[in-house]
A protein has these predicted regions:
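A glycine-centered beta-loop-beta connector
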Residues: 27-30, 35-55, 96, 104-120
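Tandem CBS (Bateman) regulatory domains
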Residues: 1-9, 48-84, 88-97, 118-156
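The conserved cystathionine-beta-synthase
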Residues: 13-32, 38-39, 83-100, 107, ...
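Context-gated lysine
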Residues: 15, 21, 44-46, 78, ...
Length: 156
């Protein structure tokens, strides 16, 4: 399954020069733990970083810095790690694990932001798939047991 099929398409975004306070207000308003910082290039939004609530807590609040002055781009991750929407779930999990991140911007072939994928989204998907598989296995076991009973009673 392509990650583009399960990513969240409504992404909270901001430019890297917004203040940390504005970024935090966006997170609160939209009930999210991160925002994707973007650059506009030819009318397209290209992810340049991701700012998390943890970044704010550790790099601003804990140090007593002024969130009205500090810019989101100054405390956000310097390396943008993104996934192409055609990437598979296993590949995405591998990148998250290797890079130690829980959220990744999702981009199209041109590098334009199209969504965000969180580890929670993948865990939910896998849990639903495993539940469906367990239900199918249980149903098959019951069917086979019923067939054995029917066949055994036919021999009597």
């Amino acid at each position: 399954m392509a990650i583009g099929e399960i990513c969240t398409r409504e992404v909270v975004i901001a430019k890297r020069d917004v203040t940390v306070k504005v970024a935090a207000q966006l997170m609160r308003e939209y009930h999210v733990g991160c925002i994707v910082l973007v650059d506009e290039q030819g009318g397209k939004r290209k992810p340049c970083s991701i700012l998390t609530d943890r970044d704010i807590a550790v790099a601003v609040t804990a140090l007593g810095l002024d969130p009205d002055v500090i810019r989101a781009g100054d405390v956000a991750a310097k390396e943008v790690i993104e996934m192409n929407e055609d990437a598979g779930v296993a590949e995405t999990v591998a990148v998250m694990r290797m890079k130690g991140v829980r959220r990744l911007p999702v981009v199209d072939k041109e590098g334009t932001l199209v969504g965000i994928i969180a580890a929670d989204d993948i865990v939910t998907l896998l849990a639903e798939e495993m539940s469906g598989l367990a239900t199918m296995i249980s149903r098959e076991h019951k069917k086979e047991a019923a067939e054995r009973r029917t066949s055994a009673s036919g021999r009597d």
